[in-house]
Amino acid sequence: MIASSVKAEVIKDNARAANDTGSPEVQVALLTARINELTPHFKQHAKDHHGRRGLLRMVSRRRKLLDYLKAKDADRYTALIAKLGLRK
């Protein structure tokens, strides 16, 4: 679980407006932060299949949000990908 201070910082960095917490950009950024925090856990605990299911669910949700954003506004999609460093 990410700390509330880190979560607030991620929201502030990716918000489109002052109180924006629900835009696809913010949701993708929060999921990315959670995924990046969980990744080292699975390097150490390779047999944690129950936790891995949750991780894969987060990755799938992020993928769907990115697909939605790409369909709605490709410029915002490319800016977000570059900002978060998701695509190689």
From Swiss-Prot:
Pfam families attached to this UniProt entry: Ribosomal_S15
Quaternary data:
Part of the 30S ribosomal subunit. Forms a bridge to the 50S subunit in the 70S ribosome, contacting the 23S rRNA.
> Which family is annotated?
Belongs to the universal ribosomal protein uS15 family.
GO BP: any one term: translation
According to the UniProt entry, where is the signal peptide? Answer: none
Please state what the protein is called. Answer: Small ribosomal subunit protein uS15
According to its UniProt entry, the function of this protein is described as: One of the primary rRNA binding proteins, it binds directly to 16S rRNA where it helps nucleate assembly of the platform of the 30S subunit by binding and bridging several RNA helices of the 16S rRNA.
Q: Which domain of life is it from?
A: Bacteria
Instruction: Indicate yes or no for the key word Ribosomal protein.
Output: yes
Q: Name one GO cellular component term.
A: cytosolic small ribosomal subunit
Q: Which InterPro entries match?
A: Ribosomal_uS15, Ribosomal_uS15_bac-type, uS15_NS1_RNA-bd_sf
MF terms in GO:
rRNA binding; structural constituent of ribosome
Keywords, A to Z, come to: Ribonucleoprotein, Ribosomal protein, RNA-binding, rRNA-binding
